[in-house]
Each structure stands twice: as C-alpha cells, then as structure tokens.
Amino acid sequence: VNPMRIVWELSSRIPDNAIVTADSGSAANWYARDLRMRGTMRGSLSGTLATMGCGVPYAIGAKFACPDRPVVALVGDGAMQMNGMAELLTMAKYANQWHDPRCVVCILHNNDLNQVTWELRAMGGAPKFVPSQAIPDMSYADFARSIGLEGITVYMPDELGSAWDRALAATRPIVLDVHCDPEVPPIPPHATWDQIKSTTEAVLGGDPDAWRMIVQGLKTKMQEFAVGRRR
C-alpha cells in the first residue's frame, strides 16, 4: 500500500470533530501532506522535537481530555515497538471510561525505521543500512486482539476504504495494521538539489532497494506535477 493513500482514504471519512495524533517519522509527513482538517478537528504531533513514541500516548491523552470525541493515531511500526504496544495496554485498561469508544491506532507497517532511512539517503548520500534500520515483523492486529482490543490487517490498497469504515465505526479501540511500501519517498515537493544529489549517491552506493526507490520516486514526482497542472 502506498502510505499516502492510507491518510488520503482517512481524510474523506474522518468525522468533523475528530482529534488526530501523529507520531514522528514518515507518519508525520503523510499526516501533514494528505489529511485535510475541517470542522472542529484538532491535530497533535511532536513537531520539531521529533520525539518517537508520542502518537499513542497523545491519543490516550486526547481521549481523557475529550472522551466524547473520536481519536485517530497515525503511528509507524518503529514507534509501536518502542513504546506503542505497551500504551495499547493502557488504552485497554481505561477504554470503558470513554463516552465515545472510538480510538483508532493506524500503524504504518513497513518493517523499517523509515524516516531515518530516507534521511541517510537524502542528507548523507548513504544507502540504507539494513542492520540498524530493519525492524522485526509481527502482527499488531493479533496483539491488539490478544489484549481485548479490535484489530484489522490490511495488505492491499482496495482493502483500505472498508477497513477505515469499520475502524471508525468500532465499539472499542481498534488497531488498523496497514502493510505499506517503505520506498515511497517522504520528500517534499521543494526538495533541494543537494537532497536529490545525495539520494542519487545512495542509489549508486548500493542501496538494497535502489530500483524500487527510483520507480516510486518517479511516480511520486509525476503525481505532484499532474496535480500542479490541474490547479
């Protein structure tokens, strides 16, 4: 699944009074670029602090502050393995105190510390260093169900819409575990020449996912160009 589509599918469905939290990493990129705020929606993220592991705790705090509003957390799998899974236990403990039970933890599951991988490529010209960047695979939906929450796993893009519909209508907190492509570049449209040069050096330096990087990078830039022309 293209990670941009995860947030794009959410944006057209999310209630006007929802609170959205985003963890640090590439999840924050897609939150900023693809979610359209409206109504009384509110958003929260760590900003320039870039603190990993904040997404699920922020969501829990939002539910305590506004127990009558739906909450959505956008979190990477690296942050989930840092502390997010432990925070799901906290969520399960206190969920019955919330007037509106809807609390969705959407996990961008790519088995990669993705933001740092792309920082190495775009800022350091270094190929992905798998020993430090790859993280263990697991089923976050299964873990959620094991502690009394709901869980949905998504592998294909055409499953996303119905999965979001189900998650946003759940009667208790739910984990939406979306397997997504780590090679979609979280690079802004105004990427500098130095960033492009460094990324090219990373490709030439033997990045293990070089071909997919090139394909997804070209697709992303072509889509941005097409949108710009339509505007």
Predicted features along the sequence, with ranges:
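Active-site diphosphate/adenylate-binding microenvironment
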Residues: 1-63, 226
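Conserved thiamine diphosphate
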Residues: 65-166
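Short beta-alpha connecting loops at secondary-structure transitions
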Residues: 41-47, 73, 117-131, 145, ...
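Short acidic, glycine/serine/threonine-rich loops at helix termini
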Residues: 30-36, 55-57, 84-87, 115-121, ...
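Glycine/aspartate-rich loop-and-adjacent alpha/beta segment that forms the canonical ThDP
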Residues: 166-231
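Glycine-rich beta-alpha junction loops
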Residues: 24-26, 109-112, 179-184
